[in-house]
């Protein structure tokens, strides 16, 4: 009887020591080139926080407001801290190539999300194809008869030179250049008030020649209504297409200020990126990318409006 009791107690002790080890929380890093004041990034961040809550793992998050050096330092700090996995955007084409090599050499999974960089050897990418998005936006304006040869298109962006805008412009140029449609990219910054001020100033000075607008980022596209109202532009007077990952833009589409918005599943993008990092940390290599995105107009904008409002 005593021997049997010892066996039972020993088995219980083994079980108690094994269970915590199996359920031990991991530490991941979620690193963004964006800024906390940008409404769309609150949704990307929400996805990361939800993942942490659902899995019980720790997710250290940071925003770098377009500061490439700061983001590079953050990724290297995560490597030095022996993170279980890293998820990061690409702040500038080629800027993380060497750092990704460092992560891979340290056997730390590093997943790229939101802004792709094919030059860097990430374990996987989760997000949209920005070149294709840009091409679709330009083609949308052409196919709908909203721009033609000789027209001028204004393309505001938060951070000129950042990966997302550079790739989107590449796609846009492939459509517009052969058709003789010209455009200008202008800086709007990541500060909401400054975005509106700069956009109002530009449109006030150039309203007569602007035949269409492509918002290369969520903050600029989500500011269209406020800019139009201040300048005296009526909804639909100037065609607009661009990013649509915020309630500001879904409402602009529903009310006719923006013709079409690009959805990228911001919450799901972060959630899936962290899931892939976790999977890789457990020894299962992803071996694939996850591409998101859908262009919506007024007839389907309510779907995305409800998602973003949590309904």
Residue ranges: model-predicted function:
Residues 53-65, 151-156, 175-193:
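Short beta-strand elements in bilobed, periplasmic/extracellular small-molecule ligand-binding domains
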Residues 76, 84-105, 172, 184, ...:
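Hydrophobic alpha-helical
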Residues 61-63, 117-142, 185, 255-267:
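Short beta-strand elements at the ligand-binding edges of bilobed clamshell
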Residues 39-57, 133-137, 163-181, 198, ...:
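Short, solvent-exposed amphipathic alpha-helices that sit
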Residues 27-51, 55, 59-76, 83, ...:
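Extracytoplasmic "Venus flytrap"
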Residues 71, 126-152, 194-196, 245-249, ...:
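Hydrophobic alpha-helical segments within soluble ligand-binding/sensing domains
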């Amino acid at each position: 009887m005593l021997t049997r009791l010892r066996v039972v107690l020993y088995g219980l002790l083994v079980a108690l020591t094994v269970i915590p080890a199996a359920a031990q929380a991991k530490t991941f890093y979620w690193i963004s080139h964006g800024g906390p004041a940008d409404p769309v990034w609150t949704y990307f961040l929400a996805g990361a926080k939800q993942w942490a809550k659902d899995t019980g793992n720790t997710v250290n998050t940071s925003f770098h407001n377009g500061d490439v050096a700061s983001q590079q330092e953050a990724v290297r700090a995560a490597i030095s801290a022996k993170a279980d996995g890293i998820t990061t955007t690409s702040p500038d084409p080629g800027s993380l190539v060497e750092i990704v090599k460092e992560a891979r050499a340290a056997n730390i999974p590093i997943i790229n999300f939101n802004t792709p960089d094919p030059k860097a050897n990430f374990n996987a990418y989760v997000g949209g194809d920005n070149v294709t998005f840009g091409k679709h936006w330009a083609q949308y304006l052409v196919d709908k008869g909203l721009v033609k040869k000789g027209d001028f298109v204004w393309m505001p962006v938060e951070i000129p030179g950042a990966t997302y805008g550079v790739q989107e412009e590449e796609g846009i140029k492939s459509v517009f250049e052969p058709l003789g449609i010209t455009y200008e990219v202008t800086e709007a910054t990541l500060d909401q008030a400054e975005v509106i001020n700069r956009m109002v100033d530009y449109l006030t000075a150039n309203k007569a020649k602007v035949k269409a607008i492509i918002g290369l980022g969520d903050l600029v596209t989500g500011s269209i209504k406020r800019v139009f109202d201040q300048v005296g532009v009526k909804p639909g007077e100037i065609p607009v297409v661009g990013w649509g990952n915020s309630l500001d833009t879904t409402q602009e589409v529903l009310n006719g200020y923006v013709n079409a918005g690009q959805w990228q599943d911001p919450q799901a993008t972060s959630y899936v990126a962290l899931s892939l990092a976790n999977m890789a940390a457990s020894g299962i290599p992803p071996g694939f990318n996850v591409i998101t995105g859908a262009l919506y107009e007024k007839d389907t904008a309510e779907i995305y409006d409800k998602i973003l409002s949590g309904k």
